[in-house]
Amino acid sequence: MQTEVILVPVIQLDGHLTVEEAEAIVFEEKPIRISPESLAKVDASHRALLRALGEGKPIYGVNTGFGALSRTRIPDPELKSLQLNLIRSHATGVGKPLPDPIVRGILLFRLNSFLQGASGVRREVVELLGQMLKHRVYPVIPEQGSVGASGDLVPLAHLALVLVGEGRARYRGEELPGGEALRRAGLSPLTELFPKEGLALLNGTSAMLSILFCTWVWARRVFRAALGIASLSFQALRGSTQPLDPRLHRLRPHPGQIEVAEQLRALLSQSRLTDTFEGDVQDPYSLRCLPQILGPVWEVLENVGKTLSIEMNSATDNPVVLPEGEVLCGGNFHGQILALAAEELGIALTILGNSCERRLNLLLNASERGLPPFLARTPGRSSGLMLLQYTAAALSAENKVLAHPAAVDTIPTSGGKEDFNSMGATSSWKAWRILGNVAHQVALEAVAARWAIGFWGEEKLSPATRRIYAKLSEIIPPPGEDQDLSPVLGQVAELIQKGGIESYGL
């Protein structure tokens, strides 16, 4: 009997990574291969650094101290120990370990940054990062400690320790000493760090970039699910489709507004519930203004994606080493661009969650539109879904606090030498936490929409949303007696974050 061989596509890394490739590597654990041409660029940069070092000139972080100690000149015999001292002294993170997808992203983005050929590291460093990705050796990196300038020094120090056989790492679900994790994966740690290699590993935006990237990937899934579930609510409330008329949106042609209106028209096409309520000439804003509310959210997602695409293919090191041998000191490690993108994303997601809470409130108080109070079978004896809105309101309140920008709250470090930090990692973490809350708010609206449609009959839904409704009905029970819905809400939120709703409908 012949065994079928399934070939898994390998993604080649050459310093030009697409967001689609990054998503496949980070979330689907697709295998990678480093292109020979990129390794040649790495070799050239390393040789250029050694030539510059041989000229005896001071080079920041290579033969000098770091930060406020940069005026201290380091003698040649101590240059390698300087790099090891750096990563040990900077590993001061606290808090819970970062989840595996974010750590995979950090490994990937640090590796891809080195493939720009401007960091001066040896190919052995690059290849070990690639092997750790391949064999799923994930450094244990605490979530707190980065101020988002001079790169993500603290989290990346915890990563760097594993490369030299120190620190801690997860391998096959077990947390181990870093050297043991490498050994079990059949890998060997670096026996020493050459000049600049410790600094190159630490001095970059890879941690805040990975947190923001993972948030953005899931945010797109949540947004698409939210649009489909809003379409269910729209029908349950018998909303008017007149505000979706393309002629209206051509008069205010913001791309996101036009896109969302078009998506809603497609989702609601052939519905037998829309345009059946005649009790008012206009619907509430959370229905009527869906394109104007969610269109800007769509545009933020598009803009953040463009920022991520540039950043993941950038050299975010300092100093940088040009192939011709010149060493330039600068600030490519500074995370301000990511901090602002993360703040914008967090605010946009908060708005998305707020709109879910408002439609949920409409569904629970829609007696004039033919639905029972709180969607209860026997109002009074049963509270129905009354408390869903409480939870949604609590999540909105939390998100409104998290949406306050950390990026405007810079705190100087290193004796004032680093006097303007981005706080980009904090901004990215806030967006990540907001996203988790919004996924639950979308789930809360989904439960109410599923119950509300149950009173009308799913056969009246548009064909596109009928498929969404069927998927939700596999998890959400029909309208009935009071029951504990907390486990259901968790399952729906997980389905949404995994993209289980976005593939249904259109």
Please tell me what each predicted stretch does.
Residues L79, L86-I87, R172, N421:
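Short, charged/polar low-complexity linear motifs in solvent-exposed/disordered segments
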Residues V5-K30, P36-K41, S45-L53, V162-L506:
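C-terminal auxiliary extensions adjacent to catalytic cores
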Residues Y60-L82, S89-N112, P142-V164, E180, ...:
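FAD-binding core of FAD-dependent oxidoreductases
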Residues K57, T72, V260-A261:
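Polyanion/phosphate-binding surface patch
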Residues I6-G56, L86-I141, F234:
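Glycine-rich, flexible loop motifs
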Residues S81-L84, L129-G130, V222-A225, E418:
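Short, surface-exposed linear patches
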Residues Q116-K134, Y138, A149-L153, L161, ...:
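Well-ordered mid-protein domain cores that form the structural environment of catalytic cofactors
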